[in-house]
Amino acid sequence: MEGFFQRYLSLYRSLITTLNELLSAYELSYSLWQVIYHIKTNGPSTLVDISARYNVEKPTITRRVHRLEELQMVKQIPGKDRREKVIQLTELGDKIYQECRKKITDLEHSVMEGIAKDEQKAAFHILPKIQENLFNREGNKSE
């Protein structure tokens, strides 16, 4: 289906812009939110864990974590290895997560209005398959 990527990228840009506007009240961007979301969902995490989850270079995640530390939303705790940096949410980070999660959930519900539940489920299941196909294609290229 030609034009799918263009449509998807247009939606993605609009969504990121909307999320950045929503999160700006907390001095956050979507990229910072991803770190908070990962830690809340997976518990204390290393920089490597977070960078692998989002397929982002470790130095990029390091900069995001430093910004969140400045905002007092995350802190480093000792890891198994002293070279390993483990990041966890602070009380403030958890509070902000709860507030933002509610707003993001409300946004999800509002943008899905008028779309049948079966169509929502189809999109929910199709997107990870596309991501997997892309990952497999990239993986096959390097072999």
Segments the model singles out, each with a brief description of its role:
Residues 14, 18, 34-37, 95, ...:
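Pre-recognition alpha-helix immediately N-terminal to the DNA-recognition helix
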Residues 1-26, 73, 95:
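N-terminal leader segment of winged-helix/HTH proteins
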Residues 42-46:
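Short capping segments at the starts of secondary-structure elements
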Residues 51:
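The alpha-helix within a helix-turn-helix
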